[in-house]
């Protein structure tokens, strides 16, 4: 189903299901002796959501055609590298105030070694926030920093809701927008960064990712995966969840608004973490992605 301005979701449908998919990839990527990440909560969160395909994937009960199996392996590596990039961003920022935008099933507030006195704000739709908070509590997990949830759609007045939860715009803040931009209309992407800029004191830091030509390239590969998923009973076409339209390049947009920006290609990120980047036409869309970090002047 195509997106609309008023659409909503839980963790088993629409954009929410992609959060569960990412958590499943994190769970798989956390296994084995040579892992880049350690997410001890991802497996349990995916099982709690209960999407049969993702549970079977965790249990090794899904047999994919060769091309799609290879793509799944690539995507697992992509999620491992991406997760590690954002983990390292928070760990290196040294800032006691952090915001996770569209937090989904992200468990960083629970699993990272936050400095004493850290406050982490997680923003997502109310049903998503409630589910993750309750499930992790049922697992006996406790946040490693002070957690303040902000249950609101990012298309609404989230800056006000964030301040109402105690956010201090005069304090430098570490922000992440992971796996988010492609699900926003181009104008909403600009508003997101405008709001972040308005809320960021000098010294604030931001990490995100940008996919040039995202809709066309990634949409085509997503449709191939959607056909395979339907064979296994999962009705999810990620191409329907993306917003088309020309976007302002994130690097230029942030620089014009007072940020010092660095960007690294996905192959460079793979090399940085000691992983070979795959070759072939199927991964060309992934090759174009940029890992972006910025510091507010």
From Swiss-Prot:
<keyword id="KW-0949">S-adenosyl-L-methionine</keyword>
<dbReference type="Pfam" id="PF04072">
    <property type="entry name" value="LCM"/>
</dbReference>
<dbReference type="GO" id="GO:0032259">
    <property type="term" value="P:methylation"/>
</dbReference>
<dbReference type="GO" id="GO:0008168">
    <property type="term" value="F:methyltransferase activity"/>
</dbReference>
<comment type="function">
    <text>Exhibits S-adenosyl-L-methionine-dependent methyltransferase activity.</text>
</comment>
<feature type="binding site">
    <location>
        <position position="124"/>
    </location>
    <ligand>
        <name>S-adenosyl-L-methionine</name>
    </ligand>
</feature>
<feature type="binding site">
    <location>
        <begin position="153"/>
        <end position="154"/>
    </location>
    <ligand>
        <name>S-adenosyl-L-methionine</name>
    </ligand>
</feature>
<dbReference type="InterPro" id="IPR029063">
    <property type="entry name" value="SAM-dependent_MTases_sf"/>
</dbReference>
<dbReference type="InterPro" id="IPR007213">
    <property type="entry name" value="Ppm1/Ppm2/Tcmp"/>
</dbReference>
<protein>
    <recommendedName>
        <fullName>Putative S-adenosyl-L-methionine-dependent methyltransferase Mkms_1060</fullName>
        <ecNumber>2.1.1.-</ecNumber>
    </recommendedName>
</protein>
<dbReference type="InterPro" id="IPR011610">
    <property type="entry name" value="SAM_mthyl_Trfase_ML2640-like"/>
</dbReference>
<keyword id="KW-0489">Methyltransferase</keyword>
<comment type="similarity">
    <text>Belongs to the UPF0677 family.</text>
</comment>
<keyword id="KW-0808">Transferase</keyword>
């Amino acid at each position: 189903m195509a997106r609309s301005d008023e659409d909503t979701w839980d963790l088993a449908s629409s954009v929410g299901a992609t959060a569960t998919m990412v958590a499943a990839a994190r769970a798989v990527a956390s296994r084995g002796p040579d892992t880049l990440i350690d997410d001890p909560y991802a497996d349990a969160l995916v099982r709690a959501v209960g999407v049969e395909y993702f549970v079977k994937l965790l249990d090794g009960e899904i047999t994919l055609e060769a091309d799609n199996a290879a793509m799944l392996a690539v995507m697992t590596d992509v999620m491992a590298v991406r997760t590690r990039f954002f983990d390292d961003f928070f760990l290196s920022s040294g800032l006691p105030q952090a915001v996770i935008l569209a937090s989904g099933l992200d468990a960083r507030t629970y699993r990272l070694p936050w400095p004493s006195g850290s406050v982490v704000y997680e923003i997502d739709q109310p049903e998503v926030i409630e589910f993750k908070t309750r499930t992790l509590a049922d697992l006996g997990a406790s946040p490693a920093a002070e957690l303040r949830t902000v249950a609101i759609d990012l298309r609404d007045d989230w800056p006000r809701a964030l301040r109402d939860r105690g956010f201090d715009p005069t304090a430098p803040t570490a922000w992440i927008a992971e796996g988010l931009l492609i699900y926003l209309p181009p104008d909403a992407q600009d508003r997101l960064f405008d709001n972040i800029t308005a809320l960021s004191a000098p010294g604030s830091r931001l990490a995100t990712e940008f996919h040039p030509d995202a809709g066309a390239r990634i949409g085509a590969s997503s449709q191939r995966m959607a056909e395979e998923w339907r064979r296994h009973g999962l009705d999810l076409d990620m191409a329907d969840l993306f917003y088309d339209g020309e976007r302002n390049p994130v690097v230029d947009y942030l620089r014009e608004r007072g940020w010092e920006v660095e960007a690294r290609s996905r192959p460079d990120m793979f090399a940085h973490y000691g992983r070979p980047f795959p070759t072939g036409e199927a991964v060309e869309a992934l090759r174009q992605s940029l890992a972006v970090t910025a510091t507010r002047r």
